[in-house]
Amino acid sequence: MASSVPSARSAYRQLLRATRIAFRDDIRVLIAARQEARRNFDSHRRQGIDTPMQINHAIEVANILRHNIVQGVRESEDEAARWELRIHDEIERGDNDSIKVGGKSVKVDKPCSA
């Protein structure tokens, strides 16, 4: 019978894939994120009571990296240069209904990812 809780190996792979997507062209940050993931997984190598919570935490971090992290890059080295955002296909895009109303409360009847 298969367990509904993903394995630590699966969560680790999801985390590595998410770092690859989020930090695609930023090698320094990509390496640092992967080292941090490895350090956290190595520090919880033995299975304990909180192992399922740790696995779920890793999966949640992977989802945040994959869907909510956008990096910006300057078009040139000039201090006044424009910033370009690296938005990929998996970024969660919301609507701007609350901005259009201007100070009035807005009832949002759908999630941002819908």
Swiss-Prot record:
Family: Belongs to the complex I LYR family. MZM1 subfamily.
Protein name: Mitochondrial zinc maintenance protein 1, mitochondrial
Subunit structure of this chain's protein: Interacts with RIP1.
GO BP annotations, alphabetical order: mitochondrial respiratory chain complex III assembly
Keyword field contains Transmembrane: no
Organelle transit peptide: 1-75
Organism: Aspergillus terreus (strain NIH 2624 / FGSC A1156)
Annotated disulfide bonds: none
Cross-referenced CDD domains: Complex1_LYR_LYRM7 (cd20267)
GO CC annotation terms, alphabetical: mitochondrial matrix
Principal subcellular localisation of the protein: mitochondrion
Region Disordered, residue ranges: 95-114
Swiss-Prot/TrEMBL keywords: Chaperone, Mitochondrion, Transit peptide
Key word Chaperone present: yes
Compartments, as annotated in UniProt: Mitochondrion matrix
Role of this protein: Assembly factor required for Rieske Fe-S protein RIP1 incorporation into the cytochrome b-c1 (CIII) complex. Functions as a chaperone, binding to this subunit within the mitochondrial matrix and stabilizing it prior to its translocation and insertion into the late CIII dimeric intermediate within the mitochondrial inner membrane. Modulates the mitochondrial matrix zinc pool.
GO molecular function, one term: protein folding chaperone
